[in-house]
Structure formats: structure tokens, C-alpha cells
């Protein structure tokens, strides 16, 4: 049995390389799918034939699968190395291309949302596994704009909020944190610092926590402006243009949750805040503290007396999955064996 080691993930199962012909072929193939799909526009009438309807759905499904593969590669590459100019360039190119493809195929979802309820139900009743997807699409009808407006928003998002998030990741992932450990100053990534934030040493927890926010505070005005930009964009689109009842309503609909359900959850959480407060008091007692500090929220209540290397930790995890369900363990093991875990510290 091979030993599991801390390694970056392999993306070879998506594409062999970032600059190989396979990626360019994927762009060409998806572009052709989008162009071919436009032929369905003239078939989308109130009296559409069921076979034509299912052909259109399967064409959307095939294009969506291809788009996910093409979009996942640069997304994972960028997530693993946010400072790579090549990763950023490909990521931006794919996002722009996806907006173009979405705009070419947008007419299908707009037509489907506008179709009369009786006709839509007749088609959904025969659509088997596609029914939930079709129903969900129609729930967005009251908040859908014209085709021209939706196209503008797709383009706006690429160069607006998506670009802001990419910029935020690029800025914050270059941060280096410095903490004194055992009398020696060490440089750490955020992931490494988080171990100290959640560690058993109260002084190290405090030092790590303060260092985390010291570094972020240096860029506070910049990060704050980016956050405000995203908030304004969300409100302008979802309240002013799409007419949602509240900013959270747009997210609730995406999550297939009625506003009333989320409101009840929030209301009950507020009314029972004392449960959370009692938990903090009890944890402070377990830690031997008069009052829980901000640095102690994630502190373990007992010191760990064992350490495990990565290989041992993986095998313990797989063993637990095996006890739960052998099939789950098999799938989890495949993720590790295929190099789909990005475990390298950096």
C-alpha cells in the first residue's frame, strides 16, 4: 500500500496540462455546442413537440457538463496558486467565455419560464429526472429580466463581482503571518496560522489571532471597499432590478427555501441566544477561565496527547468511512489515490 503524502492536487484528469491542445479543443467544442443549440430557438413554441423538448434539455445537459469541466480546471488551479499569472489569465478567459456561452443559450430558460403552467406541467410530467430542475427554473420567473438585460448582467458580473472576488483572493492569499513559537519567529500561511488559533496554548492562540487581524487590517480600507462594492452590486441587481422582497430573498430562492422558513430560523435563533451564551460560559469553565475571550472560542477543551502524520490520519479517516459504509470508503480512497486532495502546505 502506498504512503499518503502532503502534495498539491493533480488536475490531469481534467486536462493533461494548462497549455496543451486539449484545453483549446474544449473551448472549440463548447463554442460549437452553443452555436448548434441556437437552432432550437425556432422550435421553442407553446406547442413544442415532447421529443424536441427533451432533445433541447439533453443538449443543455451535455453543454453544461462540458462547461463544468472547462471551468473547473482554471478554478482549481487558481485556488491552489492565486499568485500564478498563468492561472489568473486562463481563469479570466474562461469566465469571459462562459458568459458568452450562457448568453447564446439564455433563450431556452427565458422561454421555459414564460410557458403557460398547463403546458409546462404536461412536459414536466414526462421529463422524469429533469422535473426538479425544470420546476426550480420556473420559480425565478418573477425576478427574470428581458433577454437583452440578462445578457448585460452576465457580462457585468464577469468584469464586476467575479473580478472583485478574484482580486480579493489574490490579495489575501499572498499574506505572510509571523508568530513567535517556542522562542523562534516563524512565517506562516493562513492555513498554518489557523492551527495555532485553534490550538491548546492560550498565549499562542491570542498571538496568532491578533497577527491574523493585524495583517488584514493593513489592507482594511481596500478590502472594505471591495466588500461594499459587492454589497451594492447585490442590492442594485436583486432589489432594484429583479424586485426581490429583501436582499436575503435572492439567496433563499437559490437554496430553494421560502423566506418564511429562513425568517423562522433567524427569529428562533435570536430568541434562544441564551443557549449559545450558556455554551460559552460552560466552555470557559472547562478551560479554567473566568470569561471566554475571543481567542478561546475554538480552543480544545482537552489537550491532545497524540500526534499523527498525514498518512496515518488519512488511513484513520478511511477506516472510519469503512465502518460507516464500504462504498463511501472506496470513493474517499479514490479521491486520495487519484491525487485529488490539495494537502500541501503553502
Identify what each model region corresponds to.
Residues 1-320, 324:
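A well-structured
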Residues 294-297, 328-346:
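Long, charged, glycine-rich C-terminal linkers/tails
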Amino acid at each position: 500500500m502506498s504512503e499518503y503524502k502532503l502534495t498539491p492536487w493533480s488536475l490531469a484528469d481534467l486536462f493533461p496540462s494548462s497549455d496543451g491542445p486539449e484545453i483549446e479543443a474544449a473551448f472549440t467544442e463548447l463554442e460549437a455546442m452553443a452555436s448548434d443549440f441556437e437552432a432550437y430557438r425556432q422550435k421553442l413554441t407553446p406547442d413544442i413537440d415532447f421529443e424536441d423538448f427533451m432533445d433541447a434539455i439533453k443538449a443543455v445537459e451535455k453543454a453544461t457538463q462540458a462547461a463544468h469541466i472547462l471551468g473547473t480546471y482554471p478554478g482549481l488551479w487558481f485556488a491552489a496558486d492565486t499568485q500564478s499569472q498563468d492561472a489568473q489569465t486562463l481563469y479570466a478567459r474562461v469566465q469571459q467565455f462562459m458568459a458568452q456561452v450562457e448568453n447564446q443559450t439564455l433563450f431556452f430558460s427565458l422561454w421555459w419560464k414564460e410557458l403557460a403552467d398547463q403546458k409546462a406541467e404536461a412536459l414536466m410530467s414526462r421529463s422524469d429526472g429533469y422535473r426538479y430542475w425544470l420546476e426550480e427554473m420556473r420559480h425565478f420567473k418573477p425576478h427574470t429580466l428581458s433577454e437583452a438585460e440578462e445578457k448585460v448582467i452576465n457580462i457585468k458580473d464577469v468584469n464586476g463581482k467575479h473580478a472583485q472576488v478574484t482580486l480579493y483572493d489574490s490579495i489575501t492569499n499572498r499574506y505572510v503571518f509571523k508568530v513567535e513559537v517556542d522562542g523562534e519567529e516563524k512565517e506562516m500561511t493562513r492555513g498554518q496560522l489557523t492551527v495555532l488559533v485553534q490550538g491548546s496554548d492560550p498565549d499562542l492562540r491570542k498571538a496568532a489571532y491578533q497577527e491574523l487581524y493585524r495583517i488584514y487590517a493593513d489592507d482594511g480600507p481596500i478590502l472594505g471597499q471591495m466588500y461594499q462594492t459587492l454589497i451594492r452590486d447585490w442590492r442594485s441587481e436583486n432589489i432594484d432590478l429583479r424586485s426581490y422582497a429583501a436582499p436575503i430573498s435572492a439567496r433563499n430562492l437559490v437554496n430553494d427555501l421560502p423566506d418564511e422558513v429562513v425568517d423562522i430560523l433567524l427569529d428562533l435563533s435570536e430568541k434562544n441566544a441564551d443557549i449559545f451564551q450558556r455554551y460559552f460560559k460552560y466552555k470557559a469553565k472547562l478551560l479554567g477561565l473566568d470569561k471566554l475571550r475571543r481567542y478561546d472560542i475554538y480552543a480544545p477543551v482537552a489537550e491532545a496527547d497524540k500526534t499523527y502524520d498525514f498518512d496515518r490520519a488519512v488511513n484513520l479517516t478511511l477506516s472510519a468511512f469503512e465502518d460507516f459504509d464500504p462504498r463511501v470508503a472506496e470513493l474517499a480512497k479514490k479521491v486520495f489515490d487519484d491525487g485529488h486532495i490539495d494537502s500541501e502546505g503553502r
